Amino acid sequence: KLNNFFEEIPEIFTNNNKKVKLIFKKHKEDFEILANRNKLIQVFINLIDNSISLSPEGSKILIQLDKLDEKFISLRFYDQGKGVDLKDSEKIFQRFYSDRQENIKNHTGLGLSIAKEIIEHLNGNIILDKSNKSDYPGACFLITLPIKQ
């Protein structure tokens, strides 16, 4: 169940150095997906960790769960960082790719490619999407996953 899963994630990031706040917007329905819990946590950690490292101190990250249709849910990860150029939307999922100018500690260039492999293994998809929220002008990653039938 995804709503229960959401409750576990903030504990991992409560002591981030930049005091970035995680906000989860759950759906009124609770969805069950067929996924290895640890692998899904790894995807969340990769996306949230990237957002924290590229967002200003004291900013927010929004993770929003929606139902696309009877078969799929969507998870959108919004941040308040500098964003990613949409022309790089395919490149960012390649192993070792980085558009970061800063020297970011522990950055390997593997996180997004691993996240993509995991999501695709779950019969889902992950893309860089254009943020439609003015208060979250940074990156927006959209994940779609099948609902357990």
Each model region followed by its residue ranges:
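Conserved catalytic submotifs in the C-terminal HATPase_c
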Residues: 21-31, 68
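Conserved glycine-rich
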Residues: 124-125
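Short alpha-helical Gxxx[C/S/T] motif in the catalytic ATP-binding
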Residues: 111, 115
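Short conserved segment of the HATPase_c
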Residues: 84-96
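A residue-level detector for a conserved hydrophobic packing site
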Residues: 40-41
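Acidic ATP/Mg2+-coordinating residue in the GHKL
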Residues: 79
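Short helix-loop "hinge" at the ATP-lid/N-box region of the Bergerat-fold HATPase_c
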Residues: 51-52
